[in-house]
Amino acid sequence: MIYRFLLLVMLITVGFPRPLKAEVTTDGTILIITSYNPETRSISDNLSAFMDEYKLRGGKRLITIESMNCKNLSEAHLWKERMASILEKYERTAAPSLIILLGQEAWASFISQNSEIAKKTPAMCGMVSANTVVLPEDSVDLVKWSPDSKDIFKDFPDYNIVSGYVYQYNVDKNIELMRRFYPNMKKVAFISDNTYGGLSMQAFVKKEMKKYPELELMLLDGRTSSFLEVSERIRHLSNDVCVLVGTWRIDCTENYVMGNTTYVLRDANPTLPVFTIASVGLGHWALGGYTPVYHKVGKEIAGATYNFLDGETGSETGVVPVPGNYVFDVKRMHQFGLDSINLPKGAELINKTPGFYEQYKHCCPIKI
């Protein structure tokens, strides 16, 4: 059942230079649709950041929050209809002035709609990738489905997308890293799990790898393989393969895997070079990678919301890519004998041995 509740956004005075009215208006309701229950930590953190910033800026519109309660990828056939039901409810009563989608599944369900309310109502998104896949028809076998990757910046001109904060995954920069460290690499093994996020990331990687016909792409796909099967495949990968880790939370058994399973995958082939496109495996398995700088985007979305609905100019922020950066595990680099390789400028280094002063900065000097 769809989880729904109302939040009345009360205006509070925080030292603004002009007097503010402590009131709530129902004119132009803001509708926020989340992929998961709002009590889920990632959703809750972003909603809290949104509410705090919106109130701080002086926003006073009624905010309605709906949850799609999405679970496993196997139920993806249901998401489009769930989204349609939510939108139809508001289309019959009072259409919102803005729709905000939080989460990959909610966003995919929204851009899979053909209704007027979906295409005409101003929309924003957060906690999503710049690259996505449109949900399939009911007859499609999701295990075998090979969708095309869509780009939010190019492929949805018929939707009224006024803003959003999106993660951009960069295959090119990670391939360049692999070649810098392993110039004899001939194959790339990409790991993705049995989630919508894993599937959309796999579709994007397949699209990008067409630029590199000289490299063979191997898919370690959680939709078709269990954790043990993926582990066994990793065990037998040859020395001309580099691994690119995408996502790894759920395998084909639809059971959530424990966080320490990536340690098991590492130990299945300890000399296998591994890179990460989404920070999974950093700190114990991956050598490094170019990844988005993940953070709560609720504050930024609130700012864009206020500027669009309540600002003097009604400005559109547009879709904003969340910055990315290079991250490397110094300890892993040393274990693989890669200390002497020049790293990209500005790279973040983790597991770095602290210097003498840093180790003993809290010690009290003794004067003899």
Report the location of each language-model feature:
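N-terminal secretory signal peptides that target proteins for export/translocation
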Residues: 1-2
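Sec-dependent N-terminal signal peptides
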Residues: 5-13
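N-terminal signal peptide c-region/cleavage motif recognized by signal peptidases
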Residues: 15-17
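Short hydrophobic alpha-helices and adjacent helix-cap/hinge residues
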Residues: 20-368
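Cleavable N-terminal signal peptides
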Residues: 9, 19-20
